[in-house]
Every structure is written in C-alpha cells, then in structure tokens.
Amino acid sequence: MPRKTVFEMSFADVYPALIRKAERKGRSRAEVYEVTSWLTGYTAEQIDAALASDISYGAFLSESPAYNPRSDLITGKVCGIQVETIEDPLMKRLRQLDKLVDELAKGKAMVTVLR
C-alpha cells in the first residue's frame, strides 16, 4: 500500500499533533487556533468544522479563505529547511503553520509570533 503524503492525510489526524506540541510546552489549544486563524483566515468554528469533516490537510491549507499576506514575514528553519526558501506553495503553507506553532511552543509572545 503506498504511503500517504502529509497533504493527503486527514486534517483531523494532523492538526491535533500541532495542538499537542504546543500544549506539552504550556501553550493552549486556543493559541494554536489563534495562529491558525491569523495565517489562514479560518475562524475557530471553521477549524472545528474541518476537524469534524474528512478534509485533507492539503485541502485545508490550499482552500484557506484569507491567507495572510504577512505570511512572507515567517522565516527560519523547520525540520532543517528554511521556510522562506520553499518553492512549492502548499509545502510552504504547511511549514509556515508548523513554524508558528514551533514559536509558540518555544515560549515566544503571541505578538511576536503573529508578526
């Protein structure tokens, strides 16, 4: 059986891992929702609806209602890769969200994380 890419995986399988990453470091689910909303334009209710649906992680990111134009200010490394140098737009979105959650988990202030 071929392996699924992260884009093909269910949003409901991937997103809770981001929440757990933040919660392990003393941050809240609400803060993960806040950075997700800032980046994608989804409301908390829309995120909850996506979690209850069978939408893929790739579709969740590519169908963002209002992707933040300030997302280009997200820089740094995620998994050893410079976020700002990623050429594939969908992979860049995935890594940008991961970077924001990483910054939360590292204890950065929300005002800093949201640029």
Where are these regions (language model features)?
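A charge-rich, low-complexity, intrinsically flexible signal that marks solvent-exposed coils, linkers
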Residues: 1-115
